[in-house]
Regions:
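Short beta-strand edge/turn micro-motifs at domain boundaries
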Residues: 2, 112-135
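Short, cysteine-centered beta-strand-loop-beta hairpins and adjacent loop/turn segments enriched
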Residues: 74-77, 101-110
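Hydrophobic pocket/interface hotspot
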Residues: 20, 35-39, 47, 61, ...
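A solvent-exposed, acidic/Ser-Thr-rich amphipathic alpha-helical stretch
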Residues: 36-89
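A short hydrophobic beta-strand element
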Residues: 88-99
């Protein structure tokens, strides 16, 4: 089991950790659409997403994932995610960090959350956002 990895440290990253780090980089550099497209390019066709902002909704397949996040963007919602720790255990990559949701009305919420990325055969099978995991 690998221990925590500081975001931005590139030594000894597994391919799965690299996909996750590159997704957060794409979000900060190119926006939400770029991050989603990067992650989907490394996903199985039947990938499942359970976004933190999805109120329990489970998205299945790239089309549902794209439609959900396109709807967020088109509504004027801005999502900013910042990883603080990344840990790998087998085929799972766990990220603790913060998510800021800025609503078109001007209201916002910032939460400390965790993301879990489950890989199968080197491709993403499942991504979930939820309450922060203990470190």
């Amino acid at each position: 089991m690998a221990g925590p990895v500081e975001p931005g440290l590139d030594h000894a990253d597994s391919p799965n950790v690299r996909v996750v780090k590159d997704t957060f980089d794409a979000l900060s550099e190119g926006g939400l659409e770029a991050a989603i497209e990067h992650l989907l390019s490394h996903s199985h066709d039947d990938v499942e997403f359970a976004p933190y902002v999805g109120a329990g909704q489970v998205l299945r397949g790239a089309d549902e994932v794209r439609a959900f996040y396109r709807g967020q963007t088109e509504s004027g919602t801005v999502l900013t995610a910042r990883p603080s720790t990344i840990e790998e255990c087998g085929d799972e990559v766990f990220v603790n960090g913060s998510l800021r949701v800025l609503r078109p009305t001007g209201g916002f919420a910032e939460s400390q959350i965790s993301w879990t990325y489950r890989f199968r055969d080197g491709r993403l099978q499942e991504a979930r956002g939820g309450p922060r995991r203990a470190a």
